[in-house]
Curated annotation (Swiss-Prot):
Coiled coil segments of this chain: none
Broadest EC class assigned to this enzyme: transferase
Chain's gene name: ribH
Top-level lineage group: Bacteria
Sequence positions that bind (2S)-2-hydroxy-3-oxobutyl phosphate: E85, T86, R127
NCBIfam families: lumazine-synth
Keywords of the record: Riboflavin biosynthesis, Transferase
GO biological process: riboflavin biosynthetic process
Main function: Catalyzes the formation of 6,7-dimethyl-8-ribityllumazine by condensation of 5-amino-6-(D-ribitylamino)uracil with 3,4-dihydroxy-2-butanone 4-phosphate. This is the penultimate step in the biosynthesis of riboflavin.
Protein name listed in UniProt: 6,7-dimethyl-8-ribityllumazine synthase
Keyword Cytoplasm: no
EC number, as in UniProt: 2.5.1.78
Pathway: Cofactor biosynthesis; riboflavin biosynthesis; riboflavin from 2-hydroxy-3-oxobutyl phosphate and 5-amino-6-(D-ribitylamino)uracil: step 1/2
Amino acid sequence: MKVVQGDYRGEGLKIAVVVPRFNDLVTSKLLEGALDGLKRHGVSDENITVVRIPGSMEAIYTLKRLLDLGVHDAIIVLGAVIRGETYHFNVVANEIGKAVAQFNMNSDVPIVFGVLTTDTLEQALNRAGAKSGNKGFEAAMVAIEMANLRKKLRRDFLEPHSNSRQ
């Protein structure tokens, strides 16, 4: 039996972090957590790209452009969508979630969903470092692990086959 899994060694990995300015009180804390996690695990400053966008819906366009560039080992999408008085919350939360899932199905680059969808600002702040850990930090760990898993899957399954065809 072969078991393949990623690890938390970030040396040499190129990671993009997409973060909206909307709900900056929360998203800035998520970004701090993500950057802390990446750097603690060896991802160097020069290999981290932070892309600031207006709001969470703009992440869909930004993800497509970053994937087209083909230079990142993983992409983290952060955000805070907080329920308001209108249906807008449902639209934004559903569309960004569907888009990330779709990109993950159709891309070779892991995209990590670090968008908080909460009923209140307090819940969002709690998940951005106040009481329930920092989901940005957690997203960084997932990005590193998945980027390494991607590399290991290629190495273990693609490279042996390409050598045998020569």
